[in-house]
Amino acid sequence: MAKKKERAVNVSGKPRHSLDVNRANDKKGAGGGAGGGGGGRSAATVRRLKMYKMRPLRDRGGKILKHDLQSKELPNTRIEPDRRWFGNTRVVNQKELEFFREELQSRLSNNYNVILKERKLPLSLLQDHQKQARAHLLDTEPFEHAFGPKGKRKRPKLMALDYESLLKKADDSQGAFEDKHATAKLLKEEEEDGLRDLVRHTMFEKGQSKRIWGELYKVIDSSDVVVQVLDARDPMGTRCYHLEKHLKENAKHKHLVFLLNKCDLVPAWATKGWLRTLSKDYPTLAFHASINSSFGKGSLLSVLRQFARLKSDKQAISVGFVGYPNVGKSSVINTLRSKSVCKVAPIPGETKVWQYITLTKRIFLIDCPGVVYQNNDSETDIVLKGVVRVTNLADASEHIGEVLRRVKKEHLKRAYKIEDWVDDNDFLVQLSKTTGKLLRGGEPDLTTTAKMVLHDWQRGKIPFFVPPPQQGEDSPSETAEPVEKSDEEGVSSDRTAAAMKAIAGIISSQQQMNVPCQKEFGVTNEDSEVAEQSE
C-alpha cells in the first residue's frame, strides 16, 4: 500500500500572504515587483489595496459614527453675542471728523510733521480727491425746482451766456495749462526768439533715457525716505523739481530730505545761507562725503534712526539716494558704511543700476543712477554741472569762456599762475605753454588744455559757488572799502571771528565737533578773497 503523501509544512517562517509587505519575491520573472523580478507585490501596492478595504465605523442602525481617513466632525458652534465682536471698534461723529480733517490739512502742509500711525487713520475719509468730490447739486438747486410741475428753471444753465465769457474762460484754461507745463512754455519762448538748438549730440542727453527714469521710479517706489543729494556749489541747479512734484501728488506718505554734499568746497557762510533757504521747504543737512574725515555723518544717521523709530510698524525702512549725476550719492553711502561698498569715480555715469546696501538691521540704503530732468539748460550748463564726461567732448575749448565768466580772476591767477589774458583763447594758449601741452611745431594743444580746466572745475580745484539768495550777517560785505596794509591784522581777526561764528552755528545745528574746510579758504588777506562772492 502506497504511503499517503503528507502536505509540506512551511517551516521557513516566511510570510505567503499577498498583502504582506515583507513577502519575499521568490519567483523570478513573474509578476510586477518593484525591481521587476518577483511575483509578489510592492509595499506601495499593498498600502493602496489596504486603503480600498477601509470602511467607516457604523452602529446597528447604519449611522456613521466615525469616518475613516477624515477628521472628526465638530459639533455646531455659536459665537458669543459680545460687543467686542459685533460692536463698533472706532466711532467718530461728523464734527470731530471735520475738525480732524482741518487740523490734518494744516499740519501736513509743514514737511517737518509726520503721521505716526498711518494704517489706523482713515485717510480715504479725510482726503477728498478732486475726481471723486461730490458736486452737491441738490444743495444749490433742489430736484423739485428743476424738474416736475413745480419746476422754476425755464432754460438749462450753460457754461457761458455769451461769446465774450466763453472766450474768457477758454483763455483762463489755456493760461492754467501753460503754467502747469512750464518746460513747454520755455521751449515756446525759445522758438519765438529763433535760438533753439534743433540738433544736439546724444551725449548731452545723458541721464534722460527711459531706462534711467525707470531706475529712478523703482527706487522711489521701494523707498520710505527719499534723500535728494544736492551740490553745495549750485544747489538750485542740481535740484529736481519734477521729483518733488511727483512725491507730493503720488506719494504723500514718503518723506523727502535735502542733503548738501561737497560743503567743503564752499565757505561756511554760504553753506549756512543755503541751509536756511532750503530748510523752509524740506529738512536740509550739510554733508561732506569722506570715509576717513567726514562731516554731517552723525546728523544724517540720527535723522535716519528717527525715521526708523517713527515707522515702528514696519520691520525695516529703505532710504533712496537720488539726484543729478556726479553729486556724490555713492560716496555718501560709502561714508555711512565707513567702507567702500559702491563704485565711485570723479566722472558721471559710474552707477548703472540701483543697488541695495544694508546699513543696520532696520535701515537699508538704495543707490540710484544720476537722473537729469529735461529743462532749459544749454550745452555749456550741462557740461559745467558735471553731467557729461569731459573726455567725450569733441571741442572742449568752447566751454572755457563760461568758466572765465563765472570764476573770479584772482582765483584763476592763483590756480594756474597766469597774470592776465585777453579772452578764453589767449588764456588757453598761455596755459598750454605753461603746462607743456604742445603739439608738433610748438603749437598749443587747446583741446587737451581745455579738458584739463574742465576736469579741475568738476573736481572742485577751481573755487566757485552760487551765493544763497538771502545772505545773513555772516556773509562778507561786497561793498567794503579797500583796507590799508596797516589794518590787515584787524581785518584778519574780524574775518576769523565771523568765520568761527558761522562754523559754530553749523556745528550747533548739526551737533558736530569738527568741520572740514579747504586749505585755500584761509584767513590771510590774499586767501580770504576766495570766500567772497564769485563773479
From Swiss-Prot:
Region (Disordered): 1-42, 464-494
Region (G5): 290-292
UniProt GO cellular component terms: nucleolus
SUPFAM superfamilies: P-loop containing nucleoside triphosphate hydrolases
Broad class of the protein's primary localization: nucleus
Tissue and organ distribution: Expressed in roots, shoot apical meristem, leaves, leaf sheaths and flowers.
Annotated region described as G3, given as residue ranges: 367-370
Biased composition (Gly residues): 30-41
InterPro entries (alphabetical): G_CP_dom (IPR030378), GNL2_CP_dom (IPR024929), GTP-bd (IPR006073), GTP-bd_ortho_bundle_sf (IPR023179), NOG2_N_dom (IPR012971), P-loop_NTPase (IPR027417), TRAFAC_YlqF/YawG_RiboMat (IPR050755)
Localization in the cell: Nucleus, Nucleolus; Nucleus
MF-aspect GO terms: GTP binding; hydrolase activity
Annotated segments matching region G4: 261-264
Region annotation (G2) ranges: 349-353
Location of the region described as G1 in the Swiss-Prot/TrEMBL record: 323-330
Signal sequence interval, chain numbering: none
Organism domain of life: Eukaryota
Domain CP-type G: 213-374
Compositionally biased tracts (Basic and acidic residues): 17-29
Keywords associated with the record: GTP-binding, Hydrolase, Nucleotide-binding, Nucleus
Claim: Hydrolase is one of the keywords in the record: yes
Function as written in the Swiss-Prot or TrEMBL entry: GTPase involved in pre-60S ribosomal subunit maturation.
Oligomeric form and interacting partners: Interacts (via N-terminus) with the 60S ribosomal proteins RPL10A. This interaction is enhanced by the addition of GTP.
Entry similarity comment: Belongs to the TRAFAC class YlqF/YawG GTPase family. RsgA subfamily.
Full protein name: Nuclear/nucleolar GTPase 2
Organism, scientific name: Oryza sativa subsp. japonica
